[in-house]
Amino acid sequence: MAIEKGEAFARRDIYIDYDFEDVTYRWDHRQGTIHVRFYGEAESPEPVEHDNRLFNDALRFGREITREEYETGFPKG
């Protein structure tokens, strides 16, 4: 199910899991930046571009997760 970018993205941080590619994303609504974390790894220090294909696939086919799930991470499998 697609994750809508409308009002939710303007009001709060969003955390997304895209298990097909073993990746999670964090949308920081205050900074307007996207951060990526692959399963089994730490969050990348550099933000991701808004037009990143994998991020947009995650929006279309991923699921929203909690901050705690994002911070804990998922095992690489």
From Swiss-Prot:
Pfam families: Tis1_ImmP (PF24154). It comes from the Bacteria. The lineage of its organism: Bacteria, Pseudomonadati, Pseudomonadota, Gammaproteobacteria, Pseudomonadales. Immunity protein that plays a role in preventing early activation of toxin Tas1. InterPro entries: Tis1_ImmP (IPR056206). This is Immune protein Tis1.
